[in-house]
């Protein structure tokens, strides 16, 4: 079953998130299991909403691709992570 992952990166701004995204390079090397990704500013930091085929695929991506790039992007706090089961999604 697909899972939704909602992240809040406290204190992170657009410049830091863009640096993290550049290091992760998901646009050119699509993560296995990623269905949908969106991000933008939220109160107190940066928000991310992802849909993944499984929590395990998100965890692997986070460990292998996000983790190594966090410090280089200037991100110093751990994200708040909320998971929810995806009952349905529509895509164009």
Predicted regions located by residue number:
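Mid-chain, well-packed structural core segment of small domains
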Residues: 69-70
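Short S/T/G/P-rich N-terminal loop/turn motif that feeds into the first structured element of a domain
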Residues: 1-49, 53-65, 74-92
